[in-house]
């Protein structure tokens, strides 16, 4: 069930892994869901949101036009992002990853986690964003023009930390210049936070008339399946630190969990028969109080048994070095 709130306005506008194959999501990449690549070539995966079948990486093998959908990784990094200013200005130069990240085209450059789902449904293609963090605008500057993306048809929020909602203000570029408004789907607890952090967007009656702020339509979601532009999303409740609830989402046979330190028992049944699992893995050696590290993430993969897994939310992890070891 989704409860539409709108906004308060002064004027009426409204992988079974055995052996385990560790794959990390590219710093920013595209995952194809059922059709050949027409955009600039990136690492790709294939799956059907309806049938759940997974194929290989060969971009020459496609499916029918009515199944054309894709996922674009807007960011795969931490809240601070990579590179960090503190590393680049450290005279001891202890972090080679951050120095590599400033090189043109470096895959070690990572912004806040988030994905864009380009879904072709009965009513055409929709662009559905999961999270708009504080680096969202930088991601959009790079990837929206590259893939010919102009509109944002909906934003679904996983939790109310800055790396998930810090870019809501930047949506004004779309609502002022591209489209009248953008629907936001958010849990009530996170909406209550937004009333404080983004009070002028939630209640536009407090702003100066004519001020250019994001025109957002807030929809409260429960921990039950809901539909956005013909696509069903099933919330995947997880813990993101002690007593802090975050949501992953299942759409088709793709399960996306970007911020997690513990998966409750009641969530595991929602992950059954998952084709592609995209999951949080902050560090290669250990977990933190709020995020899985790679060892714990691999344990969860063995338990969930998806057909394929990608890890996201990496900290200062040298992806190029890892790829060389695997080659």
Residues covered by each model-derived region:
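Binuclear metal-ion centers of metallo-dependent hydrolases, dominated by the metallo-beta-lactamase
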Residues: 3-13, 19-22, 26-37, 41, ...
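Residue-level signal for inorganic ion chemistry
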Residues: 71, 194, 309
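Residues in the short beta-alpha loop(s) of Rossmann-like NAD(P)-binding domains
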Residues: 77, 133, 188-190, 314-317
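Short aromatic-enriched loop/helix-cap "lid" or pocket-rim segments at secondary-structure transitions
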Residues: 82-87, 196-198, 323-324
């Amino acid at each position: 069930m989704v409860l539409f709130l709108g906004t308060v306005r002064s004027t009426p506008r409204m992988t079974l892994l055995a052996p385990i194959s560790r794959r990390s999501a590219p710093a920013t990449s595209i995952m194809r869901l059922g059709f050949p690549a027409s955009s600039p070539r990136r690492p790709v995966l294939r799956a059907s949101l309806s049938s759940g079948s997974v194929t290989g990486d060969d971009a020459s093998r496609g499916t029918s036009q009515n199944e054309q959908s894709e996922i674009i990784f807007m960011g795969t990094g931490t809240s601070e992002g990579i590179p960090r200013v503190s590393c680049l200005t450290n005279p001891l130069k202890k972090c080679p990853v951050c120095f590599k990240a400033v090189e043109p085209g470096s895959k070690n450059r990572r912004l806040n986690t988030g994905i864009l789902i380009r879904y072709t449904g009965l009513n055409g293609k929709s662009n559905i964003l999961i999270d708009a963090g504080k680096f969202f605008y930088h991601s959009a500057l790079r990837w929206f023009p590259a893939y010919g993306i102009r509109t944002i048809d909906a934003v679904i929020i996983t939790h109310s930390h800055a790396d998930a909602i810090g870019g809501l203000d930047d949506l004004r570029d779309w609502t002022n210049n591209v489209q009248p408004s953008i629907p936001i789907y958010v849990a009530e607890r996170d909406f209550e936070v937004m009333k404080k952090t983004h009070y002028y967007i939630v209640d536009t009656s407090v702003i100066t008339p004519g001020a250019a702020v994001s025109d957002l339509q807030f929809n409260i979601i429960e921990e039950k399946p809901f539909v956005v532009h013909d696509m069903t999303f099933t919330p995947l409740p997880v813990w993101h630190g002690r007593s802090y609830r975050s949501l992953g989402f299942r759409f088709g046979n793709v399960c996306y969990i970007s911020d997690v330190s513990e998966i409750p028992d009641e969530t595991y049944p929602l992950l059954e028969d998952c084709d592609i699992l995209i999951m949080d893995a902050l560090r290669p050696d250990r977990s933190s109080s709020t995020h899985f590290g790679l060892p714990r993430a691999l344990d969860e993969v063995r338990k969930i048994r998806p057909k394929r897994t990608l890890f996201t939310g990496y900290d200062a992890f040298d992806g190029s070095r890892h790829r060389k070891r695997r080659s």
